[in-house]
Design a protein with these regions (language model features):
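Phosphate-binding chemistry for phosphorylated carbohydrates and sugar-nucleotides
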Residues: 1-145, 158
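Catalytic-core signal marking the mid-to-C-terminal active-site face
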Residues: 144-204
């Protein structure tokens, strides 16, 4: 395992290093470096949702956010959509998987999209995630705005998010079950516009 206790899935060591050394930012990649997460100067983890917010706002300010749209997946945090609404930025939601993100981008002429996990696609340069490119783009924004990474995320509040995996015999049948549908509807009504519930089949 080339990323044993390291990389984007074990970012604790990077958080500690950034704070101890007084660094401006840190970047963590997965094994093939198509995913990138960041650590700000305070040691906070900057997820793919943060990155989409930062660069989406940056592109909008410069009139380069084609179709005024950032492409996300259904797994993005509810707070990201609230922040986009406040900034007047449109968004699209695709199924989970960077291939679905890129398919939407290609069909609709969008320039930026990605996943919470750190797969970020800049379609002007690539058709898939590129961790090194994502790092460069984040530093570009920091330099252009003369701002710390933590300042770039101030307009984004990440809502509490809980992921639960439930084993079932038949994934499709479980989602179509009347009791499951009723339970989901009840939660949606209780949350209103303050949160959301997502029930989906796992791809594995």
């Amino acid at each position: 395992n080339i990323n044993n206790n390291a990389g984007s899935t074990h970012i604790e060591g990077l958080q500690k290093l950034v704070v101890e050394k007084g660094l401006d930012v840190g970047f963590a990649y997965d094994g093939d470096a198509d995913r990138c997460l960041c650590v700000d100067e305070k040691g906070n983890v900057i997820t793919g949702d943060h990155i989409l917010y930062i660069y989406g706002c940056y592109m909008k300010e410069r009139g380069k956010l084609l179709n005024n749209t950032v492409v996300t997946t259904v797994m993005s945090n509810f707070g990201l959509y609230k922040a986009f609404d406040e900034q007047g930025i449109g968004y699209a939601k695709t199924a989970v998987g960077d291939k679905y993100v890129y398919e939407y981008m290609a069909k609709n002429g969008c320039r930026i999209g990605g996943e919470q996990s750190g797969h970020i696609i800049f379609s002007k340069y690539a058709s898939t995630g590129d961790g090194i490119l994502t790092s460069l783009k984040m530093m570009e924004v920091m330099m252009a705005r003369k701002a710390k990474m933590s300042q770039l995320t101030e307009g984004l509040t990440i809502y509490p998010q809980v992921l639960e995996n439930v084993r079932v015999v038949d994934k499709t049948a479980a989602q179509e079950d009347p009791d499951v549908k009723a339970a989901v509807k009840a939660v949606e009504e209780a949350l209103g516009d303050t949160g959301r519930i997502l029930v989906r089949e796992s791809g594995t």
